[in-house]
């Protein structure tokens, strides 16, 4: 079985380690004259390998049931592990000394036995994890997304296997060739940008700006504006976007705390998350493969259609936009499309540019399509700046039907030709940006049938997200209730004994989920159910766990009756 593990490192502890490496290398460079920054990065890479090895060893000790899709917080690890300690954020001076000392000891042991942790005792493991791990997110890979491996006999009979697949009318996504017998943990350490104090305004400005032609074409709508005066501060970074573009989009840097935990909180059937992630990763990998491959090979973009556009559609409130943003967070954490040589640093790994369709439209004729051209021109400059740095740019268009409506329908309704011009401009600009290996476009829609056929045809993958099933509702309730217990809103009496709330009330919550699923309720509405419950039946906090579950059942009954 294969597991993807996203390892969120405690930012304050990581800063102590980075500072220690810098101090050591500055002293060393005075004597040897070596590049202290390069040596410091190398040591940081060794430290992260050590951390991954310790986490892997810990996960291998867990029972199979716990390795299913779940989140393990640093607090849980601290409560469970003998030898763990709780540290402040940021650590005290004494705790910083402990962090430095333990890291040096374990790094020495780790390097002396060629990257193994067998000689490290469990107490050291637990102490190490409590100092450096903030959260571990575990995602079990579905069998349909594990690489296909054929044995010798299957290769000889390959034709027969293919005939049986093509002749079958059923779509079976769990064929027999996929599974391995040994557990595999693919671990991706990361630290959210907000947790790194080293961030300084303008820290990502680099010499790449000098390589870009600063003079923009006059017909691009900038009226003589150049990249020099298009550089603006957004958050902690300077990026080459004009003020006009910044008025039309929202910018998010990745990985960010805003999006952390969203991927795990979402539950969909048919492996939609895994499929969407696979499509996005392969799209970026194919583009990068062409860039880093043999210069004499034929352009792969002429052989494989890769428009860098994924479309997610479904009813309102099903989590389409959240899914897209969470996908980008995971891409920035796992970075499977990059060369994998970078360590945790203060630079962003990706940017989400969320296009506001409502702001794109103007009352002046021709201005709407001009706004789209300006935004895409700025995005192109941003792509050029980050192209060689392994940083991807995602354009997110929410409710894309506003700017990609069917031109046939617009013409038949005698709509203004400005709407048609907007669609034409959007398609042209998407075609223009697909050549960049670090570009990805995500679009969401509530009305797939209203979209222009040419836009839908450009999508490399079209994914339907419907209202949650009973299993999906159960997952949503579980996530919401766990947050309420953690925040102290619900008083769970058995928590001190190690019993999980979900284990105690599993049968009851499942019945509530089945009741809600009979009336086809959106995920957004289900997330409101605990708030409805508290508002209608309680006046003070915390609330008793048994009383909360009873009130939740009553609220579910009311909600179901109102939707019939």
Swiss-Prot record:
Signal peptide: none
Family that this chain belongs to: Belongs to the AAA ATPase family. PCH2 subfamily.
Binding site for ATP: 314-321
Gene that this sequence comes from: PCH2
GO biological process, one term: reciprocal meiotic recombination
Induction: Induced at the onset of meiosis I and reaches a maximum level during pachytene (at protein level).
Keywords in alphabetical order: ATP-binding, Chromosome, Meiosis, Nucleotide-binding, Nucleus
Single GO molecular function: ATP binding
Recorded superkingdom: Eukaryota
The name this protein goes by in its record: Pachytene checkpoint protein 2
């Amino acid at each position: 079985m294969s597991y993807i593990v996203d390892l969120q490192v405690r930012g304050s502890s990581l800063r102590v380690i980075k500072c220690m490496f810098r101090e050591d290398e500055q002293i060393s460079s005075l004597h040897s004259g070596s590049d202290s920054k390069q040596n410091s990065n190398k040591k940081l890479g060794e430290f992260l390998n050590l951390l991954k090895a310790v986490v892997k060893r810990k996960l291998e000790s867990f029972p199979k049931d716990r390795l299913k899709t779940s989140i393990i917080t640093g607090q849980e690890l601290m409560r469970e592990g003998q030898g763990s300690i709780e540290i402040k954020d940021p650590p005290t001076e004494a705790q910083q000394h402990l962090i430095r000392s333990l890291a040096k000891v374990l790094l020495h042991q780790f390097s002396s036995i060629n990257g193994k942790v067998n000689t490290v005792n469990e107490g050291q493991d637990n102490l190490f994890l409590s100092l450096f791990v903030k959260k571990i997110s575990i995602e079990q890979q579905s069998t349909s997304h594990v690489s296909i491996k054929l044995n010798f006999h299957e290769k000889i009979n390959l034709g027969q296997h293919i005939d049986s697949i093509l002749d079958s009318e059923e779509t079976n996504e769990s064929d027999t060739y996929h599974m391995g017998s040994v557990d595999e943990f693919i671990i991706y350490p990361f630290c959210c940008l907000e947790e790194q104090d080293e961030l300084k305004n303008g820290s990502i400005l680099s010499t790449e700006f000098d390589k870009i032609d600063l003079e923009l074409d006059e017909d691009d709508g900038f009226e003589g504006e150049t990249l020099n005066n298009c550089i603006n501060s957004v958050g902690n970074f300077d990026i080459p976007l004009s003020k006009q573009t910044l008025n039309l989009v929202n910018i998010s840097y990745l990985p960010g705390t805003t999006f952390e935990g969203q991927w795990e909180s979402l539950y969909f059937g048919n492996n939609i998350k895994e499929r969407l992630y696979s499509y996005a990763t392969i799209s970026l990998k194919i583009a990068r493969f062409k860039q880093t491959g043999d210069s004499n090979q034929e352009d792969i973009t002429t052989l494989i259609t890769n428009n860098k556009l994924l479309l997610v559609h479904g009813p309102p409130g099903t989590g389409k936009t959240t899914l897209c943003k969470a996908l980008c967070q995971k891409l920035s954490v796992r970075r499977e499309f990059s060369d994998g040589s970078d360590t945790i640093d203060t630079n962003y790994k990706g940017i989400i540019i969320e296009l506001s369709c409502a702001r794109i439209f103007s009352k002046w004729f021709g201005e709407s399509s001009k706004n789209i051209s300006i935004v895409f021109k700025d995005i192109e400059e941003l792509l050029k700046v980050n192209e060689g740095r392994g940083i991807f740019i995602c354009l997110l268009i929410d409710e894309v039907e506003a700017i990609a409506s069917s031109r046939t329908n617009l013409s038949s309704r005698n709509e203004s030709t400005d709407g048609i011009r907007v669609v034409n401009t959007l398609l042209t600009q998407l075609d223009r940006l697909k050549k960049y290996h670090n570009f990805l476009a995500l679009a969401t829609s509530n009305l797939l049938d209203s979209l222009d056929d040419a836009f839908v045809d450009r999508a490399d993958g079209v994914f339907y997200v419907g209202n949650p099933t009973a299993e999906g509702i159960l997952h949503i309730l579980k996530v919401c209730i766990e947050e309420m217990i953690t925040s102290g809103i619900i008083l769970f009496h058995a928590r001190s004994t190690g019993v999980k709330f979900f284990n105690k009330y599993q049968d009851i919550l499942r019945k509530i989920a089945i009741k809600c699923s009979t009336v086809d309720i959106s995920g957004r509405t289900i997330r409101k159910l605990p708030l409805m419950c508290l508002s209608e039946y309680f006046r003070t906090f915390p609330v008793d766990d048994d009383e909360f579950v009873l009130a939740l059942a009553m609220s579910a009954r009311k909600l179901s009756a109102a939707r019939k």
